[in-house]
UniProtKB/Swiss-Prot annotation:
Sorted UniProt keywords: Transferase
Name listed for the protein in its UniProt record: Homocitrate synthase AksA
Record organism: Methanosarcina acetivorans (strain ATCC 35395 / DSM 2834 / JCM 12185 / C2A)
Catalysed reactions, semicolon-separated: acetyl-CoA + 2-oxoglutarate + H2O = (2R)-homocitrate + CoA + H(+); 2-oxoadipate + acetyl-CoA + H2O = (R)-dihomocitrate + CoA + H(+); 2-oxoheptanedioate + acetyl-CoA + H2O = (R)-trihomocitrate + CoA + H(+)
Functional note: Catalyzes the condensation of alpha-ketoglutarate and acetyl-CoA to form (R)-homocitrate. Can also catalyze the condensation of alpha-ketoadipate with acetyl-CoA to form (R)-homo(2)citrate, and the condensation of alpha-ketopimelate with acetyl-CoA to form (R)-homo(3)citrate. These reactions are part of the biosynthesis pathway of coenzyme B and biotin.
CDD domains from the UniProt entry: DRE_TIM_IPMS (cd07940)
Recorded family membership: Belongs to the alpha-IPM synthase/homocitrate synthase family.
InterPro entries named among the record's database cross-references: AIPM/Hcit_synth_CS, Aldolase_TIM, LeuA/HCS_post-cat, PYR_CT
A biological process term (GO) from this entry: coenzyme B biosynthetic process
Length: 405
C-alpha cells in the first residue's frame, strides 16, 4: 500500500473555502506539559523528548521557564546548545531578570507574556493595563536590543476585549521588531467558531505572525487550533498526549494527523508518534485514556464482528488511517460482538485452523465466556477454548470402532 493510501482523505474539504494553511508547530510539552500537577521531568528525559521532537520535524520546541530554578535554566541551556534543526524557545515574564535568564540560555526565541484581561489585571496583577503593557514593552525592547527573537504573548486573550488586543499588538509591532504575537485561550473557553473569529480579527490588523495556544477544558483544543490555522494563525502550540494545566492542551499526535489527513501537510514524521506518546506516558506517569485519539490503547482495536470481518479484507473500511502511519499496531479482539467470519480470520492469524463444526462450537463458547467474564477474551483464553473445542469434537472410542466396522 502506497504512502498516499495510508489514510482516507476528507473530500468534503474540497467544498470548503479557507485560507491555505501556512503553519509551524511549537511543541510546549517541556514547559506547559510539565505544569501538569505532579509532573517533573529530569534533564535526561527532557533531552530525550527534545531529540524526538526535532527528529520528527517540529519547528519550535519550548524547552522551559528558566527562572523557575537553576536546574531548569541548566536544562533549557543544554537543549538550546544541542544543535537541533528545531528552534528553541523559553518562557519569560515581562521582567528584565527573566529576559536575562533567556539570554543566558542561548535560546532562539523568548516568549514574553502578560495578561490584558480585566480578570487578570484586577485579581492577579492588581495593576492597570497601561502599567502591564509598559512592562511588556520594556522587556521586549530589552530582549530585541540583545538580539533575541520575541514572541509577545497575551495570556487569557480569549477573555480580553478584541479592540484591546488589536491596539496592544499594533503598538508592539510598530515600536519593536517582534516575530510573533500570541493568543492564549488560557481557560479553554473558545470553540472553533469563536476561535476563527478572534484570529481573523487579529490577522486583519497585524503583519506579524500569529500564534495560537489552546487549552482543552471543553475538549476542543485541537479543533480550536485547527480553526485558528484556517483563520491565519502561523504557529500552533501542542503537547504530547495533550498533557498540561488542568485538562491539558491541544495534543501533538492529533494535530499532526489532522494536518496530514485534512489538509495534506505531510512533512512531519508521524511514524514516531506512538513511541513518543509512550515515552511521555512513562516520564509523566500519566497514561492516556484507552480511547485517546491516535495513541490510545483502543485507537486501532476492533471487536465487532461486522467491523473485524471488513477490516480483514480492507482495513480502511473502519480505520481513518492505518496504525503504521503513527507507529501503532492493529489489535483484533475476540468478545461478545465477534461474529463467525471475524473469529475465523482472527484464529487463522494466530496459527489455528478449525473445521466449520469446531468454529460454530467455539463461537458459542466465546459468547458464554464473555457474558460470564463481562470482558473481551485474551489470546491465552482463546487458545484454551480452542483446545476445549478440539477435545470435545474428537470422536469417542465407540464412534471410532463404529467407523472401522
Amino acid at each position: 500500500m502506497s504512502e498516499s493510501e495510508q489514510y482516507s482523505r476528507n473530500t468534503l474539504m474540497d467544498f470548503i473555502e479557507y485560507r491555505p494553511l501556512d503553519i509551524e508547530i511549537c511543541d510546549v510539552t517541556l514547559r506547559d506539559g510539565e505544569q501538569t500537577p505532579g509532573v517533573v521531568f529530569t534533564k535526561e528525559q527532557k533531552l530525550a523528548v527534545a531529540s524526538e521532537l526535532d527528529s520528527m520535524g517540529i519547528e519550535v520546541i519550548e524547552a522551559g521557564f528558566p527562572v523557575v530554578s537553576a536546574y531548569e535554566k541548566e536544562i533549557v541551556k543544554e537543549i538550546a546548545n544541542q544543535g537541533y534543526d528545531s528552534r528553541i524557545c523559553c518562557l519569560s515574564r515581562a521582567v528584565k531578570g527573566d529576559v536575562d535568564a533567556a539570554l543566558d540560555c542561548d535560546v532562539d526565541i523568548v516568549s514574553i507574556f502578560i495578561a490584558m484581561s480585566d480578570m487578570h489585571l484586577k485579581y492577579k496583577y492588581h495593576r492597570t493595563l497601561e502599567d502591564m503593557l509598559g512592562c511588556a514593552k520594556e522587556a521586549i525592547e530589552y530582549a530585541t536590543d540583545h538580539g533575541l527573537n520575541v514572541r509577545f504573548a497575551a495570556e487569557d486573550a480569549s477573555r480580553t476585549p478584541i479592540d484591546r488586543l488589536k491596539q496592544a499588538f499594533k503598538e508592539v509591532e510598530n515600536e519593536y521588531k517582534v516575530q510573533y504575537v500570541s493568543l492564549a485561550d488560557t481557560i479553554g473557553i473558545l470553540n472553533p467558531t469563536t476561535t476563527h473569529y478572534l484570529v481573523s480579527e487579529i490577522f486583519k490588523c497585524v503583519n506579524t505572525s500569529i500564534c495560537i495556544h489552546c487549552h482543552d477544558d471543553l475538549g476542543m483544543a485541537t479543533a480550536n487550533t485547527l480553526a485558528a490555522a484556517e483563520a491565519g494563525a502561523k504557529q500552533l502550540h501542542t503537547t504530547v498526549n495533550g498533557i498540561g494545566e488542568r485538562a491539558g492542551n491541544a495534543s501533538l499526535e492529533e494535530m499532526l494527523v489532522a494536518l496530514r489527513v485534512q489538509y495534506g501537510i505531510e512533512r512531519y514524521d508521524t511514524t514516531k508518534l506512538t513511541a513518543l506518546s509512550r515515552m511521555i506516558s512513562e516520564y509523566s506517569n500519566i497514561t492516556p485514556s484507552v480511547n485517546k485519539a491516535v495513541v490510545g490503547q483502543n485507537a486501532f482495536t476492533h471487536e465487532s464482528g461486522i467491523h473485524v470481518a471488513a477490516i480483514l479484507e480492507e482495513p480502511r473500511t473502519y480505520e481513518l488511517f492505518l496504525p503504521e502511519m503513527v507507529g501503532g499496531k492493529r489489535n483484533l479482539v475476540v468478545g461478545k460482538h465477534t461474529g463467525t467470519k471475524a473469529l475465523k480470520g482472527i484464529i487463522n492469524s494466530i496459527g489455528f485452523c478449525l473445521e466449520r463444526e469446531e468454529l460454530c462450537a467455539l463461537i458459542e463458547k466465546v459468547k458464554v465466556c464473555t457474558d460470564e467474564k463481562r470482558r473481551s477474551i485474551s489470546r491465552e483464553q482463546l487458545e484454551k477454548l480452542i483446545a476445549q473445542v478440539r477435545q470435545e469434537q474428537k470422536p469417542s472410542a465407540s464412534e471410532k470402532e463404529k467407523f472401522s466396522i
